[in-house]
Amino acid sequence: MKPLSSPLQQYWQTVVERLPELLAEESLSAQAKSVLTFSDFVQDSVIAHPEWLTELESQPPQADEWQHYSVWLQEALSNVSDEAGLMRELRLFRRRIMVRIAWAQTLALVTEESILQQLSYLAETLIVAARDWLYDACCREWGTPCNAQGEAQPLLILGMGKLGGGELNFSSDIDLIFAWPEHGCTQGGRRELDNAQFFTRMGQRLIKVLDQPTQDGFVYRVDMRLRPFGESGPLVLSFAALEDYYQEQGRDWERYAMVKARIMGDSEGVYANELRAMLRPFVFRRYIDFSVIQSLRNMKGMIAREVRRRGLTDNIKLGAGGIREIEFIVQVFQLIRGGREPLLQSRSLLPTLSAIAALHLLSENDAEQLRVAYLFLRRLENLLQSINDEQTQTLPSDELNRARLAWAMDFADWPQLTGALTAHMTNVRRVFNELIGDDESETQEESLSEQWRELWQDALQEDDTTPVLAHLSEDDRKQVLTMIADFRKELDKRTIGPRGRQVLDHLMPHLLSDVCAREDAAVTLSRITALLVGIVTRTTYLELLSEFPAALKHLISLCAASPMIASQLARYPLLLDELLDPNTLYQPTATDAYRDELRQYLLRVPEDDEEQQLEALRQFKQAQLLRIAAADIAGTLPVMKVSDHLTWLAEAMIDAVVQQAWGQMVARYGKPNHLNEREGRGFAVVGYGKLGGWELGYSSDLDLIFLHDCPMDAMTDGEREIDGRQFYLRLAQRIMHLFSTRTSSGILYEVDARLRPSGAAGMLVTSAEAFADYQKNEAWTWEHQALVRARVVYGDPQLTAHFDAVRREIMTLPREGKTLQTEVREMREKMRAHLGNKHRNRFDIKADEGGITDIEFITQYLVLRYAHEKPKLTRWSDNVRILELLAQNDIMEEQEAMALTRAYTTLRDELHHLALQELPGHVSEDCFTAERDLVRASWQKWLVEE
């Protein structure tokens, strides 16, 4: 059992002051202290009934004790002689068992599924016992209700909602519907009543027995509004009246509610089977029924409006991604396909969710994420309610209850709990939107002209004329018509169901009206149809674009601006979800928040599911790349900020990959034993090149080297003991594998580790001492140049400090100016001969004379040349800040440094935009002449003339 957090330990002293002498602190177990600190409801209950605590300590709650509820309750009711006694015993029994459930739940003695089962069965036991006692009492008073054949007629109770599904909350009201089988009259009583009168009176007394507050509290708040005609309808209906109502007037929301309906008590009797058979055709249609989506969407819209109207913030049931949305997701499939798939006719959510996955209606990943989210949310909800036995789904705002929930949910503090909660609810919302979406787009009347429908549906030939394309050139008009015709032919080759074609027929006129209004219609349409070809068999994505006009507009504008984005969306259509929220689409994650967002994103994936972990990493990266590119296109991110975001994203990925690899290696071999007396992992990842210099582009690979500080004699401490240095080698190999494994979402990054000591011939991971020795005694000048742009991107503080010291020492070595100048210049000339532009009359922005690499070589040369005299030059690893340092330390004139900085950022900006256009990094020879002349002059000054 986890110790109480500091705030709860302080609160325990307040609890001690409330406890009677009979419950002295020294007599209480650690478990009792924890539960009493967590729940005021349990506190109040055991103060009033100390024997309950004794019972809990001697007979702790068990997962299967719900099987004994009925026997225990019958014993409690055995001496009850009147209604007041019945009410008292029901309330005391309910409170005693709820204390036991709260105890088990708080200490996590049983699973959440078991808690839900116990809560539901307790309610059913109390309802049925009350009904049976009252039925006997009413029969003694008014006679037994019978049908025309003289057969006794029972009261059947339908438990609705979570009660029916076996998923009741800790503090829940109960939704009931009362019914009796056949008309008739009472027999054997002092006066005759017809059955409707008998069951109405009995129903009223049953509600009073359960619902009316007394000095002992109440059993359950009873809600009868789900019955036919609601509050204006009869309290109890005959089977015939129920059947007439649901056949003639039953509404979609009532179908939705009836999915979970369960007969309380004897569910296998003749009348129970008759009622169940009567209701099934109303709930589960024989045909696949897609109409329910709009009905559920309307219901969700009503709930969303109520949430806004009542200001229900932080509501884990009704809020976006909350419990209600998971229920909606599951019941969409039940209502659409339940009539054809018996597996989907379960009342309980979790078995139905498993059936949905087994039938491949949702991906296993989505289904598992929903399952985990549901159990997380239900545990949080039940814990929240068990604090005061209060019906609430709103997260607390006070520090005490936040500390209670964080502790009980096994989190260090409230921010960690809310971080995990956000991750779960975000994932639920994603699946919900894919299936159901919002109701707003459907409330707007269709306004497209018939001409756009004709353009899509009539398959016009390229020589046909249509007024909607009149603004395009002849060539563009023919291209557009040809592309539409080709796209339709491609669709004929695909397996697209009726729903998919229906959605396409709704989507395409909208899409064409937006695309063809553009001057670049032909280019944009070619990019979007390539994307659509990839998703036409996945109706969910088509529906997303069809039902969210804003998402469609973002798609069109982004694809028009960048073929790179169009290609990315075509390869990974999951990214289409990102189009739903322009607030996040055009505003990338804060640079210092990538690690935290990624951590939250990965919480939705089981830690031991390596395949899904790899997918999640790649999907997160792609979504973030899309946001960065969208902001770049929109002009909200300058080039320096684009690279900052790409670099922070890469660092977050490196951190997550190392964490995964480390966990896998430690699970297999244990930790190297030299770590036992220190913090950290004795491991560092050093970024070189663009990563080290904060200058990553959209398709940049990562130049990495791996360092460790493991002694020669270290071994791992696991069952499969291996040499400590071998452990770090396997760790580095595992990291490379996690980066390069190709999944359905591609690879994470290309990683180049050849900058390590001795290059490809050297060990993949190097000891810190060997790295320092190599740099001092064997490294070439070009390797010292590379060190200028190197920095630790992952590593414990000791190893980071060691690397920084080695880097500073190497860079501040005294060097003979002429020799250094010659070596740097010759290396640049070799590179230019090997990598320079092979295209005549073109300028390679990076590799040609006057380009980016020349600027990088100038800064590297000057750092190596003057750092011995000016050690501050070693501070930064990026070119822009190095140029600032050169000016600040009087090595380079400020005007020259600023001019080189402008040239450098201008050229890099062009490279970014060429990447967005999927174009190579060369331009016309007459481009950037001023920048190139400036760089050439600086090169001549520093690397030729001195």
Swiss-Prot record:
- Source domain of life: Bacteria
The entry's function note states: Involved in the regulation of glutamine synthetase GlnA, a key enzyme in the process to assimilate ammonia. When cellular nitrogen levels are high, the C-terminal adenylyl transferase (AT) inactivates GlnA by covalent transfer of an adenylyl group from ATP to specific tyrosine residue of GlnA, thus reducing its activity. Conversely, when nitrogen levels are low, the N-terminal adenylyl removase (AR) activates GlnA by removing the adenylyl group by phosphorolysis, increasing its activity.
Is Transmembrane there in the keyword field? Answer: no
Q: Which residue ranges are recorded for the region named Adenylyl removase?
A: 1-440
The segments labelled Adenylyl transferase in the record are: 449-946
Q: Which HAMAP family match?
A: GlnE
What gene name does this entry carry?
Answer: glnE
- GO-annotated cellular components: cytosol
Its cofactor is: Mg(2+)
A GO MF term: ATP binding
Q: Does the keyword Magnesium apply?
A: yes
> What InterPro entries does this protein's entry cite?
GlnE, GlnE_rpt_dom, NT_sf, PII_UdlTrfase/GS_AdlTrfase
Q: Which reaction does it catalyse?
A: [glutamine synthetase]-O(4)-(5'-adenylyl)-L-tyrosine + phosphate = [glutamine synthetase]-L-tyrosine + ADP; [glutamine synthetase]-L-tyrosine + ATP = [glutamine synthetase]-O(4)-(5'-adenylyl)-L-tyrosine + diphosphate
Give the protein name, as stated in the record: Bifunctional glutamine synthetase adenylyltransferase/adenylyl-removing enzyme
Tell me which family the UniProt entry assigns to this protein. Answer: Belongs to the GlnE family.
Going by the record, the broad EC class of this enzyme is transferase
Q: Which cysteines are joined by disulfide bonds?
A: none
Which E.C. number(s) belong to this protein? 2.7.7.89, 2.7.7.42
UniProt keywords, alphabetically? ATP-binding, Magnesium, Multifunctional enzyme, Nucleotide-binding, Nucleotidyltransferase, Transferase
GO BP terms: regulation of glutamine family amino acid metabolic process
